[in-house]
Swiss-Prot record:
Belongs to the TrbE/VirB4 family. It is found in: Cell membrane. Pfam families: CagE_TrbE_VirB. This is Type IV secretion system protein PtlC homolog. ATP binds at G456, Q457, S458, G459, S460, G461, K462, T463. InterPro entries: CagE_TrbE_VirB, CagE_TrbE_VirB_cntrl_dom, P-loop_NTPase, T4SS_component. Keywords: ATP-binding, Cell membrane, Membrane, Nucleotide-binding. GO terms for molecular function: ATP binding. One of its GO terms (cellular component) is plasma membrane.
Length: 824
């Protein structure tokens, strides 16, 4: 062994290493949720979700701030102290999805590779209540037997339960889900009977910088916690574990700003490094607090250039303290920044100090008593708190506002896993779903509302977003035996390339070209017969002139006659041949229907025969799959629009049989301008969830959508709302029509049009999310559906003569690149 001057070569390292048991105050788990320290303090911790501050109204933020101040006032006494931790750490984000379709597999792989290029981060808030029975109680422990000690402990636990109940009641408003907004950390037992403590898991992270489950030990906690070697230098610490080596540096406040407000430290929630912010607050008695304010006022009065306003502020503060508007307590702050590389850590520390100083605080690196700052992170470690300051409960509430981001729901949704993973400006993953359900509820298999509205101006990325979500839906095709059916009511062929890439069927309805529709070939069921009576009566109506009762009877007889024939013989022309012309009313009926028949009964061809008088009915949604219908042409034809709409919707209803079902409408205002679609959309908004389905509506014209007859249903019966950037957004449309808040409206207006950002709103929560597919040119070409790509797509289909996407997609990309290079 190397020795130098009688010391080992590692003596210097050994001197810097701390035996940490002496710095850990905890003795044991008193209950599943409560620890007891060696000094008989009781410790209980909750995880708090926090409020989604990005989209919260200022009034709500102020209200929550006052609620926190009121809570701290209500529980303040010399026996109560609080530790609050904001932990920003790396997290594993991702969704395990299996796609049968090759394009979807490729898209998902490329997209996840892009997401993984930036480390996902998460923010977590933990509130720890420390209850100190006091020295009198400690003396009683020494003079009484175990029974008396146990009785006292139970009394203290009951008092802690009362305080904890008040905390939980107040903080249930600080989260996405009232029931899960605050959850106490307890113990869990695994299938092998091993007990794990979530409280000890948090404490172990504070000591090691590494998140790992911690079992409840049989022995003392101070000898059990802390699996890393801790080496303290002049300004940096090293946390060395068997699996990793991490470095830590601390920041604290040297001077506080002149005022505080909710969310003053929110800028730190967007940073790209890991950290732990620790706040502690222990209220002092009113007499001591008043004496402190009086001393501060006297000191200012003795300074010649002191501002009179500051002295007045302190006088008002004394009055407010006496009135009980706030309490004052000892406060300490620290920020431990973690990293794997010392040089990068120094850069991160510099960034953090800049963010803090921008808000009026003087931040400084901790260089003295570095290990004290480290151990002061542990709740109830009173002796090690550095640089304590006197602070009001209102200021404390401003520094610890529990501001966070809405993260969506990863698992346990009605259809299982989240539909898609979206990035956010903060780096926190957002798990997107059409359905909106309780965050900690397992809602798999439940029929819940999932209707979604997408609002975005032209060029904002609406088509790409719609098609991307359509592709992500394909994971549910193989999820169970029922599969998935999607029907996309398209406009301007924006989804055609994508639907074809999914090996779906796409129907373009164009004036004068046979549609492939033949309603008379429907199975002869009561429901279909009733529908045919209604459809054919509409076809026979002339200029809003209704049919007579005799004409209705004649038509009904002819329908039933034709339905008894073999399917190959059932056509509109056949129907016409089975209407007798003994009366003028019957002859008028034949004349009207003749316009829809290949053989109009007068030796000619009806002008509209191409709509329904086709030899075979090609419309079939009975099998799970993806279907697209382009309405660009027929939606502008007032004469054919409603009959075609009626038939499409009747057939679509057949597909809503309990399988997962989604219908999408691009430029929904144009579709629901037709009475048939309007009635369908209005009714289905209310009932489609009972059939395991949902509708997705998009538009670039909010005014037209809001002016529709079924606008109320389209607005009120949506579980999810998506708003893309729109600097010209009309205030009345967004605030009065869509019921956005002022903050949400300003976010929609302020997002850059090329930022790929959008606002997702579900219930009371909203988040700014992002779908940035930059660099994914091949995938974007299929998702975007612009005019140039459509031309290349048509050429690729003509060259390959194949519907199989594996054949035409490669040719499509080659043609597209040649067109971009000017070779074609």
């Amino acid at each position: 062994m190397n020795r130098r001057g009688g010391q080992t070569a590692f003596a210097a390292i050994a001197r810097n290493e701390r035996a940490i048991a002496a710095f850990i105050p905890y003795s044991s788990h008193l209950t599943d949720t409560t620890l007891i320290t060696h000094g008989a303090d009781l410790v209980r911790t909750w995880r708090v979700q926090g409020i989604a501050f990005e989209s919260a109204e200022p009034e709500l933020v102020s209200q929550r701030h006052e609620q926190l101040n009121g809570l701290w006032r209500a529980i303040s006494c010399e026996q109560v102290a609080l530790w609050i931790h904001c932990i920003r750490r790396k997290t594993q984000a991702g969704l395990d999805a299996r796609y049968e379709n090759p394009f979807c597999r490729a898209l998902d792989a490329s997209y996840n590779a892009r997401l993984n290029a930036r480390q996902a981060m998460t923010n977590e808030f933990y509130l720890t209540l420390v209850y100190r029975p006091g020295h009198a109680a400690l003396g009683k422990r020494a003079h009484h037997g175990q029974a008396e000690v146990r009785r006292q402990l139970l009394a203290h636990v009951r008092r802690m339960d009362e305080i904890g109940s008040l905390i939980e009641t107040t903080l249930r408003s600080h989260g996405e889900d009232h029931e899960q907004a605050i959850t106490v950390l307890g113990c869990e037992t695994d299938s092998a009977g091993r007990r794990y403590s979530r409280t000890l898991t948090l404490l172990e992270f504070l000591l090691t910088g590494h998140w790992q489950p911690v079992r409840v030990p049989a022995g003392p906690l101070d000898a059990y916690l802390g699996s890393s070697r801790i080496l303290a230098g002049a300004e940096m610490m090293e946390l060395r574990s068997p699996t990793c080596r991490r470095y830590a540096q601390f920041i604290d406040f040297k001077e506080y700003g002149t005022h505080t407000e909710p969310g003053m430290l929110n800028a730190l929630l967007y940073e790209d490094y890991e950290y732990v912010i620790t706040h502690s607050f222990s209220a002092v008695g009113k007499r001591q607090a008043l004496a402190y304010l009086q001393r501060q006022r006297a000191q200012l009065a003795n300074v010649q250039d002191a501002a009179y306003s500051q002295i007045d502020d302190l006088a008002h503060a004394e009055d407010a303290l006496v009135n009980g508007d706030f309490v004052i307590g000892e406060y300490h702050f620290s920020m431990m920044i973690l990293g794997a590389d010392p040089r990068q850590l120094r850069r991160d520390v510099s960034s953090a100090m800049t963010r803090i100083q921008e808000r009026g605080f003087l931040a400084t690196p901790v260089t003295l008593a570095l290990d004290a700052a480290f151990y002061a992170q542990l709740p109830a470690n009173w002796a090690y708190r550095p640089r304590k300051a006197m602070l009001t409960s209102r200021n404390f509430a401003g520094l610890c506002s529990f501001h966070n981001f809405y993260g969506g729901k990863r698992d346990g949704n009605p259809w299982g896993p989240a539909l898609s993973l979206l990035s956010t400006p903060s780096g926190q993953p957002f798990y997107f779903n059409f359905h909106h359900s309780g965050l900690d509820e397992d809602c798999r298999g439940q029929m819940m509302l999932g209707n979604t509205r997408i609002i975005g101006q032209s060029g904002s990325g609406k088509t790409v977003l719609l098609n991307f979500l359509l592709c992500q839906l394909q994971k549910f095709r193989s999820a169970d035996a029922d599969g998935l059916t999607t029907i996309f009511f398209d406009k301007d062929r924006g989804a055609e390339i994508c639907i074809r890439a999914l090996d779906g069927q796409y129907l373009r309805i164009r004036d004068g070209e046979p549609t492939g529709f033949n309603p008379l070939q429907l199975p002869c069921t009561d429901r279909n017969v009733m529908f045919l009576d209604s459809l054919l009566a509409m076809l026979a109506r002339a200029h809003d002139s209704p049919l007579t009762s005799a004409q209705h009877a004649t038509l009904a007889t002819a329908v039933r006659t034709v339905l008894r024939m073999p399917a190959s013989l059932r056509r509109m022309s056949t129907l016409l041949q089975n209407i007798t012309q003994a009366t003028s009313e019957q002859r008028e009926l034949v004349r009207r229907l003749g316009r829809w028949c290949r053989d109009d009964g007068a030796g000619g061809t009806g002008m509209l025969w191409w709509v329904f008088d086709n030899p075979n009915d090609c419309l079939d949604f009975s099998r799970p799959g993806n279907y697209g219908i382009d309405g660009t042409a027929f939606l502008d034809n007032a004469e054919t629009r409603t009959p075609i709409s009626m038939y499409l919707l009747h057939r679509m209803n057949e597909a809503m049989d309990g399988r997962r079902f989604v219908y999408l409408m691009d430029e929904a205002w144009k579709w629901i301008d037709d009475p048939a679609f309007a009635e369908f959309a209005g009714d289905q908004q209310l009932t489609i969830r009972k059939k395991n389905g949902l509708g997705v509506f998009s538009t670039q014209m909010p005014s037209s959508l809001l002016g529709a007859r079924v606008a109320a249903s389209l607005v009120q019966q949506c579980a999810t709302e998506i708003y893309l950037p729109n600097p010209r957004a009309d205030r009345a449309e967004y605030l009065d029509g869509f019921k956005c808040t002022e903050t949400e409206y300003q976010l929609i207006r302020s997002m850059a049009e090329d930022s790929h950002l959008f606002l997702v709103k579900q219930g009371r929560q909203a988040v700014v999310a992002q779908l940035d597919l930059s660099g994914m040119d091949d995938e974007l070409a299929i998702l975007s559906g612009n005019a140039r790509n459509l031309r290349c797509f048509e050429q690729a289909l003509a060259l390959t003569r194949e519907r199989d996407p594996n054949d035409w997609i490669a040719v499509f990309h080659r043609l597209r690149r040649e067109a971009s290079a000017g070779l074609r």
